Curated annotation (Swiss-Prot):
Pfam families: Molydop_binding (PF01568). InterPro entries: Asp_de-COase-like_dom_sf, FmdC/FwdD_MopB-bd, Formylmethanofuran_DH_csu/dsu, Formylmethanofuran_DH_suC, Glu_synth_asu_C_sf, MoPterin_dinucl-bd_dom. GO terms for molecular function: formylmethanofuran dehydrogenase activity; molybdenum ion binding; molybdopterin cofactor binding. PANTHER family: TUNGSTEN FORMYLMETHANOFURAN DEHYDROGENASE, SUBUNIT C (FWDC), TUNGSTEN-CONTAINING FORMYLMETHANOFURAN DEHYDROGENASE 2 SUBUNIT C. Its EC number is 1.2.7.12. Consists of five subunits; FmdA, FmdB, FmdC, FmdD, and FmdE. It catalyses: N-formylmethanofuran + 2 oxidized [2Fe-2S]-[ferredoxin] + H2O = methanofuran + 2 reduced [2Fe-2S]-[ferredoxin] + CO2 + H(+). In the N-terminal section; belongs to the FwdC/FmdC family. In the C-terminal section; belongs to the molybdenum dinucleotide binding protein family. The lineage of its organism: Archaea, Methanobacteriati, Methanobacteriota, Methanomada group, Methanobacteria. Sequence repeats lie at residues 76-88, 95-107, 114-126, 140-152, 159-171, 178-190, 197-209. Pathway: One-carbon metabolism; methanogenesis from CO(2); 5,10-methenyl-5,6,7,8-tetrahydromethanopterin from CO(2): step 1/3. The keyword Oxidoreductase applies. This is Molybdenum-containing formylmethanofuran dehydrogenase 1 subunit C.
Amino acid sequence: MGFVLVPKSDFQIPLEADTIDPICLKGWDLDEIRSLQVYEGNIKRPLGEFFEIAETSHEDQLIRIDGDVSRVKYIGSGMKSGKIIINGDVGLQLGCEMKGGEIEVNGNVSSWIGMEMHGGTIKINGNAGDYVGCAYRGEWRGMKGGKIIIQGNAGNNIGGGMMAGEIYIGGDAGNFCGIRMNGGEITVRGDAGRAPGAEMVSGIIKIHGRISSLLPGFKEISTFKEDGSLMILFKGDLSEKNPEGNLYINYNKNLHILENETDEGRVITKKGIKVIYNSGSTIREGQIIKGGNKLTDDYIDECARCCISPEDYKLLGEPENVVVSSHGNEVVLRAVEDPGIQMGTIFIPRGIWANVLTPPYTESTGSPMYKGVPVYLRKASQGERILSAEELVEEYGVGK
């Protein structure tokens, strides 16, 4: 025997309803199901206070929800068997830690679906939010099995920390698809944002559309045809230890990335040249700030610098200082020609100057993502100088 749940009215306060699980309802009568407890805010209330609940003659362990439950969280959390069909939009953390069974949504879903799931199938016949199949905040191991199918578009950080399983996106994906991926497979039939596969060490990502930018830590390996499209395989992310990640992108839709630009073909606008900014902590930086002091001349010398490829350094006129600008902020940095930097990218040590340039929306499991940020780079004028850490804190409010 299955059950049908219909919301009695709009939800004024979000509900936490992990009790909506086929195995929890098996063998229960209607009165027992109506008395199951859910959280409205921090107050426990009976499920029957919010839903009309009726029996249905459909298959056993089937729950059908008819209506908008976009403010209901944790539906199918930890689910092991059975099926849930939702005809409407759904809230956060659908099917998190799911181990088996099937969830199908005829609508859109919010973020964090399939968090750390181990098995089962989630099918979304609409769009999904951010962090699909991702890890919890503070954790690094995401989805460990199962399958997530999204027929529409999905947001940022898809498959973050993914260990195993499959994610299929029929539309577009946002930024950092497959970030810190350790296994499994992600397929995106449409376009994707910037930096797919950032910090991945294993697994497969296939993007059949256009990507905004490719991190320099990916090495081109081979070209082949798949489903009539010419695809290129990249290995990476080479910024990680012993990486075995496989990133496939569509050749014809990514000529802006694949065709090597020459000095003659690059244009310097009023803002400068467009490059990809990456950041990371350095050994010397760690030695300097041991003890917490970031206000020394040594700290400025190490962190207020911009490493530039020889080609871009020459294109800019071999400057002493450069201005790097991003999302309305800009910093002046000492220019350093570095043969180890790929043309079209720059490296800035992770410090207060880098924080000014790193947009907050690049977050990944709680921290901003200091890789793959599009910025502009130009030669500094005579009156533009490098600001101290104190001056940057005063001007931009970035933390020490």
